[in-house]
């Protein structure tokens, strides 16, 4: 029974009360999902390549432990790219990162912003596309250089294998 799975319930009244439950709340990250966010879409403006934009973002977020920043660093490492150093960086709590990135490889550096759409708007960055069905519900990370919008990344935390089946089984109970 339940005790062999490590579940102990003290009193039958608790089991009886389960019949009246109509809502279950689960922690998403690491419970429903794998807990390993990954870049799943990259969109840049004309004239800016994926590599340039991602390396600028990676440089700005080099020392961040935020899960979205870690996803960017993992992507760079998987590609075998070197994250360029930044001259300075600043965390803007609940918004994103500001950094000064010197020129690197064949790319110009500049004043880099990485973060939320709201952060970009507050910093006077315009030209961002409207949020649409392809980005709805995903984690978006916007990137700008010298006040100009460069593009965005979408980052997803993959759902654990078998979780959809488990949730559907719970729904039927």
Which role fits each region the language model picked out?
Residues 10-173:
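Cytosolic catalytic headpiece
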Residues 1-12:
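Juxtamembrane helix-loop transition segments at the membrane interface in multi-pass membrane proteins
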